[in-house]
């Protein structure tokens, strides 16, 4: 039994000896080269000079260094300790310093959960102020953080479980000689002494420059019960932490002494301290090169700036003449449009039309705009164009795209209008990626565009001819209401006058046959609107060459469906049959009526609006009426004259009365081969397209000037076209333009006049 008790005593004494060897009451680091008792973490390293570097000049770092052995505090008496260390905070040139250095007393050396920057490498947002987090820290902080109640960017504080200091003061020391506190710049890069003393329940903190003795008055003195803060006082670790953020610096510990007895701290020997490294700018030698280099650089910079200035000036250059001053209120600067469209970038590109590219833009006032860039080769007609653009700006109608103004550069015009968020109508008709418009939406668009054209023809101060009515020029606003836009070809003339233009411009399929000989008129707009109505209803383009012959031309195809009493078969299949049949038939018939090749048989836009709103019944006509369902394409390059090979006969009203047509005119044609082509410079195109095979002799019924007069029937065999007669016909039309302009005095449509002249030439040849 005694032997067994002796063994227990021996083992216990060995265990106590082991614990005593692992715990210490004091230590000193005159150099940190002996790393046996050091615990280093994160960016903390020991330099060859013996300096302990906690952080280097890198962003968002933190470093920890602890004495590896726990401190042996008394388990019964009051807790006390003293520590004295020398540190240096060296900022990187041109940067603010890091977040500072902290002396730490903690039951653990593990701070992997901590955050850098303002949390100093020992705290984080979740542990901030937690009573279960047992940490005492003395901070030398060089960043002002109002969230943590910092007083400035150069202070010393006492932290308990939180980065919010329980005691804080600007870095300074008490001078007995001056009897006042002298400030210290923590980021001076010079070594600074720090003393931390705790006895009883009072914690004192002092700082001073390296050459100054410990001040007689501490900088901070605050009561703290460390017995409550550290219930397990037998296992506490002392060390340092440092952190950086976007503010960076090198943070060093040069020397460190610690003891649980205040009087047993080892004295500092300044002569043995390692030198603190300071980053310095490279030494510059004064030489001729150094003197000339700034001069050369200055000249180069001036040259570059001058080049950029002239390039920028040329980039935003505009053309402005004296006559444009009256239009200044409607003119945009190119600079503002360039910035609004982000330099006409691809991201703002909306599309490309026949007259230019369109871009989306945002003005500084928040207004969205569409900018069309139109090229022109000279100044001829520009003044008239600008004047008409400004006049268009005065047009006010809910179904017109508002035109805000213009900008003019060399060989370029820019038209500024309101941006329509839902794009153009043709995208919703032909693009499967776009949502399908219902019939009710399409009818609203048709009615709106009809109202807009009526306004342009009769409601404005001058008659406005749009000259390019088609689905791609119809824009849809946020509510999918139709807005007529793209006035790039519009022309003005006084009410009761004629449009001062003879140029045949427009889009193939929408151009009235008389456009090339008579020029633009309200009737040519009506024709294009008729094609547009059929386009919206049928969901197809006016001419689609890839289809079968009978379906190739929309106008003819719709008329053929009407002849077969199957008009609804021509409707857009994407509607899925969801429409009002009466409305669809009315719109289709009205489209055929408006696209009649006989101009006098077309309604006015005022009548069209009344028809669409059911305020006026449609006139009595059929698919066999003269000019209904006949497609007469117009070739606008005027390089040849084309007439179909056919024979014609003239008769009086007695023949027309037996015809199913209710119009006094009947024009039948054949699907015979097209007439031969003769090349003549600046000649006009007259194209007659046959409808279906028939005998060589066909008939044209003309109105009689006198109901009592008798007209003999003139018949002939098929006569082949002859180049000479075509040339003569062209020469007659060019030499006697009054035939086109005064044809109405003869009571005959101009097409009949042209065909009659041709056949009279043929008969004369025979």
Swiss-Prot record:
Keyword Glycoprotein listed: yes
Tissue-wise expression: Expressed in leaf petioles.
Disruption phenotype: No visible phenotype under normal growth conditions, but mutant plants (e.g. lecrk-I.9-1 and lecrk-I.9-2) are defective in extracellular ATP-induced calcium response and susceptible to an avirulent isolate of the oomycetes Phytophthora brassicae and Phytophthora capsici. Impaired increase of cytoplasmic calcium concentration in response to extracellular ATP.
Example of a GO biological process term: defense response
Enzyme class name: transferase
Topological domain ranges for the Extracellular compartment: 22-289
GO cellular component, one term: plasma membrane
Keywords associated with the record: ATP-binding, Cell membrane, Glycoprotein, Kinase, Lectin, Membrane, Nucleotide-binding, Plant defense, Receptor, Serine/threonine-protein kinase, Signal, Stress response, Transferase, Transmembrane, Transmembrane helix
Residue ranges annotated for the Protein kinase domain, each copy included: 344-616
Entry keyword Signal: yes
Glycan-carrying positions: 56, 124, 128, 181, 204, 225, 232
Compartments it resides in: Cell membrane
Record-annotated active site: 468 (proton acceptor)
Listed EC numbers: 2.7.11.1
Effect of residue 572 to N: In dorn1-1; loss of kinase activity. Impaired increase of cytoplasmic calcium concentration in response to extracellular ATP
Cytoplasmic face residues: 311-766
SMART domains: S_TKc
Any one GO molecular function term: protein serine kinase activity
Stretches that traverse the bilayer: 290-310
Entry superkingdom: Eukaryota
InterPro entries: ConA-like_dom_sf (IPR013320), Kinase-like_dom_sf (IPR011009), L-type_Lectin-RKs (IPR050528), Lectin_legB_Mn/Ca_BS (IPR019825), Legume_lectin_dom (IPR001220), Prot_kinase_dom (IPR000719), Protein_kinase_ATP_BS (IPR017441), Ser/Thr_kinase_AS (IPR008271)
Annotated region described as Legume-lectin like, given as residue ranges: 24-259
Function noted in UniProt: Essential receptor for extracellular ATP. Binds ATP with high affinity through its extracellular legume-lectin like region. Is required for ATP-induced intracellular calcium response, mitogen-activated protein kinase 3 (MPK3) and MPK6 activation and ATP-induced gene expression. May play a variety of roles in stress resistance. May be involved in protein-protein interactions with RGD motif-containing proteins as potential ligands. Plays probably a structural and signaling role at the plant cell surfaces.
Subunit details: Interacts with RGD motif-containing proteins, suspected to disrupt plasma membrane-cell wall adhesions, via its lectin region.
PANTHER family: PTHR27007
Name listed for the protein in its UniProt record: L-type lectin-domain containing receptor kinase I.9
